[in-house]
């Protein structure tokens, strides 16, 4: 019982650190898995192993999905005002290629970013 709670608290601490690092760095388009691992203080293999077991994603998938979820929130907030276009949203969340962003977004959410912005979901 004690080892389980220690493991759970260790996993929780790890995930809290992971979230803190991603929140601080996701806008940086040069922030990639190696930087992520270095900031958390673990090897790439350990990062991937732990994230896969805890949330079912590799480090690369986690970074991309985090960025896409933030982008989705930005698009939903910008529906009425249209203060940002899709390319600006892509750059804001750390993608440096709007076309790649659109492909990833569409695959993740089954709607294009512009479709979501224009209420076509």
Feature locations, PLM:
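Terminal helix-turn-helix DNA-binding modules in bacterial transcription factors
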Residues: 53-96, 119-121
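Generic structural signal for short, solvent-exposed loop/turn connectors between secondary structure elements
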Residues: 1, 118-119
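Short, Lys/Arg-enriched, Trp-marked, Pro/Gly-tolerant hinge/linker segments that flank
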Residues: 1-16, 53-61, 65
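General nucleic-acid-binding
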Residues: 1-7, 14-46
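Basic/polar phosphate-binding segments, predominantly the helix-turn-helix DNA-binding elements
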Residues: 33-62, 90-112
């Amino acid at each position: 019982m004690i080892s389980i709670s220690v493991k759970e608290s260790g996993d929780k601490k790890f995930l809290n650190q992971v979230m803190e690092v991603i929140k601080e760095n996701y806008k940086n388009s040069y922030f990639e898995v190696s930087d992520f691992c270095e900031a958390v203080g673990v090897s790439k293999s350990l990062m991937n192993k732990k994230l896969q077991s805890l949330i079912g994603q590799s480090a690369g998938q986690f970074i991309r999905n985090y960025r896409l979820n933030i982008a989705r929130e930005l698009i939903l907030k910008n529906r009425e005002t249209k203060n940002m276009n899709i390319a600006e949203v892509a750059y804001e969340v750390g993608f440096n290629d709007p076309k790649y962003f659109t492909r990833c977004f569409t695959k993740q959410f089954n709607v294009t970013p512009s479709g979501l912005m224009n209420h076509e979901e």
